[in-house]
């Protein structure tokens, strides 16, 4: 069975420069995740600068998600300071029922 997870990750203080330096490796890793990604994007502050990330991911279980997170460049490099993970069930996407 495939499980869906909502991952909300907040950057640490003053991490924008480091985030941007690590971003190419983050995006490469995301590209390698392929169909594990339901959707993903950056959280923005009031000035439109990135301050975190939101991802909806599919994995067989929480252990597989944790394995991904333990190797995620933003985690390894200390960009993400606080990560909240919740189980999720996407029902509607782009206005269409998917489950």
Task: Identify the meaning behind each predicted range.
Residues 1-99:
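Conserved, structured core segments of small domains
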């Amino acid at each position: 069975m495939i499980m869906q997870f909502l991952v909300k990750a907040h950057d640490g203080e003053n991490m924008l420069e480091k985030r941007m330096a690590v971003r190419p490796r983050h995006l490469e890793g995301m590209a390698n995740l392929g169909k594990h990604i339901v959707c993903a994007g950056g959280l923005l502050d009031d000035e439109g600068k990135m301050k975190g990330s939101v991802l909806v991911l599919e994995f067989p279980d929480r252990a597989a998600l944790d394995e991904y997170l333990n190797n995620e460049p933003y985690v390894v490099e200390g960009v993400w300071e606080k990560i909240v993970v919740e189980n999720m069930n996407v029902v509607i996407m782009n206005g269409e029922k998917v489950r």
